[in-house]
Amino acid sequence: PKEIENQLAQLDVTALLHSVERREQLPDSISTIVFESLESILSNVEVEDTFDWTFEDRDIAVIMNTSATTGQFKSVPLRWGQIRAHVQASKEVLGKTEQDNWLMVLPLFHVSGLSILLRSLYNGTAVTILPKYDEAQVLKLIESENINMMSLVPTILTQLEPSITHHKLRVILLGGEFIPMALIDACEKKSLPIYKTYGMTETFSQSVTFSVLDYPHKRDSVGKPLPGMQVRIDKPDADGVGEIHLTGPMVMTGYIDKEPIDGDLNTDDIGYIDEDGFVYILNRRKDLIISGGENIY
C-alpha cells in the first residue's frame, strides 16, 4: 500500500477506479470509484461502432511506472505518436491477418500486456484476455486453434512447451528474461514460431525482434531493430561491445519530472551489433534478475 500511495502522490492522482478486492491496498487519502467487475460496467454502456476522436501524437496516452535499476520507480509518459509508430513497425515485421487472435496472459499494468491490447485495437484484430494465468486454460485455448498469437516470458513457455501437441500459432513473442537455449531447441523441433524480442517500457515494449525459425543461425541474438528504430553501441571496446542506445519514434521523450533525453535512450544494457545488423545482449541492466517480466533486486 505504501508503494502505491507514493506512486499516486508523485503523479498527482486525484481519483482512482478500482475493483472491490483492491480497496485494502489503497490509501484513504484518495477518492475512489469502486466497481464489481469490468463486465458489469461494460454491459451497461452503449457504444457506437466508430469513434470520432482525435489523438495528437504529442498527447500522453498512459503513464507507466518502471521499477528502475536503483529500485526507485520512474514514471514513463507513453504518447500516442510512440504507440502509433510501434504498432505500424511491429505489423511490418509480424504481419497481420483477419484471423489474428492474440492470447494475453501478461498483466495490463506491464507494458508487454498493454502493448498487446493496443496493437490489437489499432489493427482491428481480436484479443483474448484471461483474468489470470491458468496453464490448463492456456493450453486448451492453444489447442482449440482459435489463438494464433501469444506473448510470453520464457518461464511460462518452459511450462507450456512439453504439452503443446497441435496449434495454429503464427507468432510467439518471447522476451522479458533470459531465454535458455534448451527452450529454443525444443520449440524449434515443434516448429513453434518463436520471435525473440527486446524492449522496455520506455520504447513501448518491442524494439528489436526476429523469427528464430527464419534465422536459426542468429538464435543467440535478440534480432534486428523494428523499422524506424535505430540501435547504436556507445563507447565500444576493441570487440565492438558497449552500452546499447536506442533512438526512433517509439522512444519516450523523457521521464516525468526528469530531464528530457533528446531522443537518445541509454538502456544501461551491454551488447554489440554483428555484421548483419543483429543485436546481441551480453549483460542486462547491471546484473538485474528478472522473473516473470518483473524486476527483482
Identify the residue ranges that each predicted region occupies:
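Conserved AMP-binding/adenylation subdomain of ANL enzymes
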Residues: 84-101, 109-149
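ATP-dependent adenylate-forming carboxylate-activation enzymes
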Residues: 1-6, 20-22, 105, 125-145, ...
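Gly/Ser/Thr-rich phosphate-binding loop
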Residues: 148-152, 158-217, 230
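Conserved ATP-binding/catalytic segment of the ANL
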Residues: 239-297
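Conserved pre-ATP/AMP-binding loop-to-beta segment of ANL
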Residues: 47-65, 72, 95-101
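Conserved AMP-binding A3 loop
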Residues: 61-88
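Structural core segment of the AMP-binding/adenylate-forming
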Residues: 1-44, 51
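Active-site loops of AMP-binding adenylate-forming
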Residues: 80, 200-219, 248-252, 258-260
